[in-house]
């Protein structure tokens, strides 16, 4: 008899009173996700399984009895869509944080790792997390790269790669299908990817940003069944009506009041409503929390606590096809969290597989890294750079005038045009403009760096560099001063990746991320401190204007699958037409001026 079968046999016996429970939780108020009730009950556990939920005080026979002292007992919380890489922590360090907050299961799309390492990146995600008490369900990334032909990452995934990954038992579905254009226009690659998911019988996650009407219907018809890219209350309502599972995310909190208001107008809060974090940086994960922070925001905006908990438990379990999770019921896995209040959720105790693993925000036993798994390093395949590499030039023009296309806007980008002066072969940056610069870092091509004018970020005072840039994770630098841009970039090349700020010839802040150029091997608290310091000091380089021109937007400046212009390692791209666009509209040579500024991009 298998160990699982033996546990179930023992659970049946214990439920009938023929043998004692391993653990009996008494004096609990059960938050019943099936009925919406809060009711007094005790919970008997055998091994990793709930054996019985029965009237309070009706059973006392157990090897161990624990009183929850009237606390509210909920199923463990579940995150239906997350990129662990956004925490910049390896899986065991990430798990140590979220487990203490009551999150016991996550659906991880490791497409950041996959865009650097290919299938090996997904294998690392599986191998590095399979031993953890956190239930980690890995998805097979569909966006490697997110927009083929417009960017080059460290690998290319199509049907064959998806079939390989979907054949692994730890892989539970197809990760967010970001190439909406390819799906809607019958791309052979995207048809292969989605069909591999359909053939596997596993989940197919969506990324339906901006889709509505006929295009949204077509996207669903292709086989996609969820979306976390909600942009408004109307968008959330339309996607629910269309039949998508919506994943309300915590990474865009400014949208939550309107989305909550829309949900409150509905006659029924469907099982199609779940929650996810998507991306949470390390300092916010530690200080505010992951899913728990989102749930508290939804409660603060007026949704009933039991409904909010249902989003993160039963609804999530239904979405993720996990019939062993999501309810406090006999036969389900004993992943449980205890709250002392339903007004503001704070995990007092967390049980995983029937074992107490965290109390009052502290893990009882630290988690070790997976034995025999070597984190991938040395992934920035770049030689040191010079300031000359960061000068914008117009070929063949030493002195003259040019009209250039440029990127306008921080989060929602639009095309712009501007006339610039050229002196001594260098474009003179117009007032209010900065530069964005991208270089391929995966060793798959040796193209020269790409550089473009950037409006809407103000005049950056120095440089910001990152090797964590959605979704191809090439080396990206923003700035106006070529010397500072080179300094920040070289800091990352030397450290194996991460983020850096430079100003007036000095490094203001640097967070090293030597694992795949996106994960740190620092203790979580130290990483959070360094990341917070870098974010705080970034205001010396940039003038932030929430909600769009914010520090987090740095990571998305090259996301070519989104509408509008973006710069990638292949050039200036258009998300709508799926074309690489020449930034040069027109230029002409003019006589050299007698006097001019000789340091336009290094000031």
Feature map (PLM): residue ranges:
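Active-site microenvironment of metallo-dependent hydrolases
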Residues: 1-46, 51, 99-101, 286-302, ...
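Short, ordered loop/turn segments at secondary-structure junctions
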Residues: 110-113, 141-143, 179, 209-210, ...
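Divalent-metal coordination cores built from histidine and acidic residues
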Residues: 2-14, 92-203, 508-512
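Active-site neighborhood of phospho(di)ester-bond hydrolases with catalytic His/Asp-centered motifs
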Residues: 74-80, 108-111, 139, 175-177, ...
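Divalent metal-coordination and catalytic microenvironments
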Residues: 28, 48, 70, 81, ...
